[in-house]
Every structure is written in C-alpha cells, then in structure tokens.
C-alpha cells in the first residue's frame, strides 16, 4: 500500500468515526428532549379564579400535537366581543409545551382577552414550516367557531416566547407582507388591519446573526428545524425566517421583552431598530445589565421584573385594543369546564 492510499484510508476512517460520534451526540440530545416532552405531559393546574380554561381541543389531524387551549375571563357578556391573542410556545422548535405558558397567559386573559395557546409538531421529525402551517390551521379552527366565542376578529394579537416568538413574528409577517405570503404559498388568516399587535418575549429575528449569540444548543435547534448543518448558507428559505428582513410598514405595533442576560438581547435590539425605521410603533422592555435576567425570565411569575413585564404588556394591549387592562376581582375558580363551550372540536 503506497503512502497516498494509506492516508486516504486514515482520513476516511477518521471522518467515519467523527460522523458516528456526532450522530451519537445528536441522538443523546434528541433522547433528552423526548424524555423532557414525556415529562411535560403532567398537567399544570391554573390557580387563577378569574379565568376558565378549555384544554387540549384538537384543531386539525394532519400533524401531531395539533391541540390548543382556550383561556377566557370568567365573566363574558354575550353582547361584548373581546380581543383574541394567539400564542406559540418556545422550546427551540424541538421541545416545549403550551401548558407551561398558561399561568402567565391567564393573567392576561383575566383582563378581558381570549387567549388561544397553540401546540405544534416538533423538529427534527417535523421541519420548517410545519409549525406555521399549524398556526394557520389553529386560527382557521377558531374562526370557524366564532359564533360560540365572543371574539372580535378585528382585534387580533399574535404572540410567542423564545422560538415561539420567532414563529409568531414570522406568522405576523406572513399576514402583513404579500411577497412573503406568496413565496410561502400561505393563505392569509388575517388582514393587516385586523392585527392590532404582536407580543414577543426573548425571540430571535435575524437568522444570519443568531449563531453569533452563542445561545446554548442553537446549532441543534436550527439544524433540527431546517435540516441543514450550515443553515445560513444551505437552507434556501432562511430569509423567510428573518423577521428583520420580512417586516414592512404594515407590521403591527409590537411589544418586545428580553432579559439583560439573555443571549438573544442583541436580536431584540436589532429588531426594535428595524421596526422604528419602518415607523412601526414598538414598546421595548429592555434592562441595563444590572438585573441579570436570563432567558424566559418572564415566566418566573414571582420576580419583580416578571410582574413589571405583565403590567407593561397589559398597558400595551390597553392602548391597542378595546380592553382596559384594569385589575379584576377574584371570582370562584372553575376548572376545565370544557363541556360548557359549544365548539366543534375534532377530538
């Protein structure tokens, strides 16, 4: 065997070993996420006497995880229509569950909003743009049942956290950017005039710079969702995901919240500047570096900053919708009265 062939074989063996180790490493990550998702099935009780929650309504059967929760105020006048908030949870596209967002979302719903909290299929089994397709399906399901809920579809809010904020921001762009919607071959769920705001917690909005944030496991998240190792160059639809590129003057007023120790802080600053350039009203809740607020601090509801975040969200909503955001009095708690809501769930 000559020297060239010997080194060729050694290189091939080295590449094979590295590939096996990488595959094993990724499998460990996927197994960990799977175990986390199984653990997530334990029901989270909402200890909020001012709301009703209708859980795990099936909105479609095409993809797995096609379930949603609806949170409403206890008191809903049949003559008064309420703004609706559609929410997408985070988890890096590969994990997470809607139920963990319900305690915070209930604090918003009790002020006079109907919240629709949407689950979706997870990567790597279900890649881009599956969650966005499912969001379309979820909004359609709610619209088809509009006679059974006092929803004002001229007062729509789109929201999400972490990867869910990226999804929610892109879903909002799909509604307000004709070119993006046509390129993605999506139907329009809402006209720009119907969307009164976007609420985004700790999201990321520029796929060309998100790797630079060094967010933990960002490589795993993006590869799982796009199917590409080098997503910035190899994934043909990467620009569709960058809301900093897809937002237009039709983008709705936006509330951006991020911790000062969150690696995605720079992404939120960049997005806020882009919206300002477009003359889109934007509320920001950013901190000065002394609060040490990590990713998803908003959901640690006992933190003073989390309490402040909810107050700022309600102020934003009161300025952009008909609900006042005034604190409610406690009412007797009603848990999961799903038989009282005459929807047409598929389950």
Each predicted region: which residue ranges?
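Alpha/beta-hydrolase superfamily serine-hydrolase fold, recognizing
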Residues: 4-347
